[in-house]
Design a protein with these regions (language model features):
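Terminal helix-turn-helix DNA-binding modules in bacterial transcription factors
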Residues: 2-42, 65-75
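Key DNA-contact positions within bacterial/archaeal DNA-binding proteins
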Residues: 44-45, 60
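A short, amphipathic alpha-helical segment
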Residues: 52, 56, 60, 64-67
């Protein structure tokens, strides 16, 4: 799956997967900037760019979408 992928892209893939988990948690109110730094990104703008390239949405758009879906599923 990752053959021919650069190391930084490989690592960023897993960073974004972790970000998706955290942003999908309705109980989490972590700021995007805090999340970016906790995942090892040097800035929130770099994190947002990488996140959008992986998911098609900014972190804030993703969080809003995940919260909306969670509310829809919970009644």
């Amino acid at each position: 799956m990752f053959a021919g992928v650069s190391f930084s892209r490989y690592v960023n893939h897993f960073r974004v997967e972790e970000a998706v988990k955290r942003l999908s948690d309705p109980a989490s109110d972590i700021l995007v900037k805090e999340l970016a730094y906790s995942l090892g990104f040097r800035s929130d703008s770099v994190f947002s760019k990488v996140f959008k390239s992986e998911t098609g949405m900014t972190p804030n758009e993703f969080r809003r979408s995940a919260i909306f879906i969670a509310k829809q599923n919970n009644g």
